[in-house]
UniProtKB/Swiss-Prot annotation:
Its EC number is 6.5.1.2. The lineage of its organism: Bacteria, Pseudomonadati, Pseudomonadota, Gammaproteobacteria, Enterobacterales. One of its GO terms (biological process) is DNA repair. HAMAP family: DNA_ligase_A (MF_01588). The gene is ligA. The keyword Magnesium applies. GO terms for molecular function: DNA binding; DNA ligase (NAD+) activity; metal ion binding. Belongs to the NAD-dependent DNA ligase family. LigA subfamily. This is DNA ligase.
């Protein structure tokens, strides 16, 4: 049995190793939750044996050593971290400790903020001008990242307004919105560059580039949450008041900052943010709760590495470790072969996860994944769980290589990978049962033809019994034939037939989307429908004509053109129309005749809207004569930026395109 000294030594060594990977190499090997668990275990042991605490223990300092490649900046006021709580009971205990330490039963109000998952930085302004910026580093000394911070558009190089202090050091978080993260990885996969495991790593890697020109290309953003140095000026005597003052001077502050009057209100804030988390557009891992009164903060003071007046209330972990038991290969509706990791089941963010996507062969190679490996699994919002990285330091001896198939696992046809594409595909087409099933599931889905009651299991049976080969065959089904399916009684069968009849009345855009043309999503389908107006005109369009549609480039235009050039596809469309599928005749909108500020303009929506859904906003803009595109280009006239707008906003600013916020959009819609 290990001695207490040995346990402490091993824990400290392990934590230092992972701190180095996290803070210095930007390549964490374990999830935050596992790091937190190890730190809690070390603290508990040191609490029981205080005589064994050493000055260099991870519990006695804030972060990790700065990278030698950067010059260093010593923080005039140490950048401390926060203590964590993980459940309501622990938060209420923290609340009680605060109340007990204050004199005369003073009322406490709480300033609650989002706990952003990025990189903590300090930014020093002298007479309102940005002069330096540094990472947290080890809490006393950080890396000089001034040149890189100056490239972040959200951070003002000069403050504006009145009564700006002679020296003001603001502290906050640099982070990368989800859209920007996806764009960076998409570009990296295309060019063979480094693919980041998560937005936090991407933000850290972007901010700590030795070449600021690379940082400038990354759509980083920033929210401030506190102050370090303050000289030659005054600030309000509440935390919220200070944040509002920062905002007046041009510093970005999250609009989710909330003042809570009681512990009950804090818990309500926590649960509301947890509910909204999937729609924020950027990663958070909890909320930060601070005593609002600066006077009370001073009374409460600090412990060795954290303030007594603040705490981070963390959400259930979105990353966990488990083992890969096998890798299987699924076939999608376009023939794409997707490797899927079969996992030892593990709870991630409150959901039991037993499968995770591996995307493609390149991703398996990048991860260095073998069957039997210990891996980190991430699940964020509604995103399909994915393997973040392999824990190489704990690789078992009996792992096996993952072998990508050369023949389709469903129909046996050759698997082909076109040069320049990451995805390998089955060449079997509609003779492949998997492709047929997935194509039909897409066709009847809610955003396509919206056939109520026709779920995946029904489609599986219809294909396996060879009742259905093409989408047109669905509309030939009878209640009698459906009754022969498993768990399908006469009433349910008739309901499906009725739903199919109802689905015949659709829109041109939905119909195009339902056909499952490669690279044609909802937005592109809507653009094609609006531009060409009728199926006959679209079918006859050349590749050059197709590229005139907003958001349609050479690749999409080629896929659309080739789809309609294929005789079997035209035959299926003819059958669908013969079965009664129809949509209203197009309403020709002449932008010149519409009195609207959006008429004739190509508009792009980015970020999340709070007052209406994206679909409703798109529909209203089209009614007013706009063309709504899915990406920003030189053809774009206007960008509407909601909360957490990412790479599209950055590109619009780079191209000098007009940008308005949701409030201005609503005002113009109303006018």
């Amino acid at each position: 049995m290990e001695s207490i000294e040995q346990q402490l030594t091993e824990l400290r060594t392990t934590l230092r190793h992972h701190e180095y990977l996290y803070h210095v190499m930007d390549a964490p090997e374990i999830p935050d939750a596992e790091y937190d668990r190890l730190m809690r275990e070390l603290r508990e042991l040191e609490t029981k044996h205080p005589e064994l605490i050493t000055p260099d223990s991870p519990t006695q300092r804030v972060g990790a050593a700065p990278l030698a490649a950067f010059s260093q900046i010593r923080h005039e006021v140490p950048m401390l971290s926060l203590d964590n709580v993980f459940d309501e009971e622990s938060f209420l205990a923290f609340n009680k400790r605060v109340q007990d330490r204050l004199k005369n039963n003073e009322k406490v109000t709480w300033c609650c903020e989002l706990k952003l998952d990025g990189l903590a930085v300090s930014i020093l302004y002298e007479n309102g001008v940005l002069v330096s910026a540094a990472t947290r580093g080890d809490g006393t000394t950080g890396e000089d990242i001034t040149s890189n911070v100056r490239t972040i558009r959200a951070i003002p190089l000069k403050l504006h307004g009145e009564n700006i202090p002679a020296r003001l050091e603001v502290r906050g978080e640099v982070f990368l919105p989800q859209a920007g993260f996806e764009k960076i990885n998409e570009d990296a996969r295309r060019t063979g560059g480094k693919v980041f495991a998560n937005p936090r790593n991407a933000a850290a890697g972007s901010l700590r580039q030795l070449d600021p020109r690379i940082t400038a290309k990354r759509p980083l953003t920033f929210f401030c949450y506190g102050v370090g140095v303050l000289e030659g000026g005054e600030l309000p005597d509440t935390h919220l008041g200070r944040l509002l003052q920062f905002k007046k001077w041009g510093l970005p502050v999250s609009d989710r900052v909330t003042l809570c009057e009681s512990a009950e209100e804090v818990l309500a804030f926590y649960h509301k943010v947890e509910e909204d988390r999937p729609t924020l557009g950027f990663d958070i891992d909890g909320v930060v709760i601070k005593v609002n009164s600066l006077e009370q903060q001073e009374q409460l003071g600090f412990v060795a590495r954290a303030p007594r007046w603040a705490v981070a209330f963390k959400f259930p972990a979105q990353e966990q470790m488990t083992f890969v038991r096998d890798v299987e290969f699924q076939v999608g509706r376009t023939g794409a072969i997707t490797p899927v990791a079969r996992l030892e089941p593990v709870h991630v963010a409150g959901v039991l996860v037993s499968n995770a996507t591996l995307h493609n062969a390149d991703e398996i190679e990048r991860l260095g994944l073998r069957i039997g490996d210990k891996v980190v699994i991430r699940r964020a919002g509604d995103v399909i769980p994915q393997v973040v990285n392999v824990v190489l330091s704990e690789r078992p001896e009996d792992t096996r290589e993952v072998v990508f198939p050369t023949h389709c696992p469903v129909c046996g046809s050759d698997v082909e990978r076109v040069e320049g594409e990451a995805v390998a595909r089955c060449t079997g087409g509609l003779i492949c049962g998997a492709q047929r099933k997935e194509s039909l599931k897409h066709f009847v889905s809610r955003r396509a033809m919206d056939v109520d009651g026709m779920g995946d299991k029904i489609i599986d049976q219809l294909v396996e019994k060879e009742y259905v080969h093409t989408p047109a065959d669905l509309f030939k089904l009878t209640a009698g034939k459906l009754t022969g399916l498993e768990r399908m009684g006469p009433k349910s069968a008739q309901n499906v037939v009725n739903a199919l009849e109802k689905a015949k009345e659709t829109t041109f855009a939905r119909f195009l989307y339902a056909l499952g043309i490669r690279e044609v999503g909802e937005a592109t389908a809507a653009g094609l429908a609006a531009y060409f107006g009728t199926l006959e005109v679209l079918e006859a369009a050349s590749i050059e004509e197709l590229q005139k549609v907003p958001d349609v480039g050479i690749v999409v235009a080629s896929h659309v053109h080739n789809f309609f050039a294929e005789e079997s596809n035209r035959n299926v469309i003819s059958e669908l129309l013969a079965e009664g599928v129809h949509w209203p005749a197009p309403i020709v909108i002449n932008a010149e005749e519409i009195d609207s500020p959006f008429a004739g303009k190509t508009v792009v929506l980015t970020g999340s809207l709070s007052q209406m859904s994206r679909d409703d906003a798109k529909a209203r803009l089209v009614e007013l004569g706009a063309k709504v595109a899915g990406s920003v280009s030189k053809k774009t006239d206007l960008v509407i930026a909601g909360e957490a707008a990412g790479s599209k906003l950055a590109k619009a600013q780079e191209l000098g395109i007009e940008v308005i916020d949701e409030a201005e959009m609503l005002r113009l819609l109303g006018s």
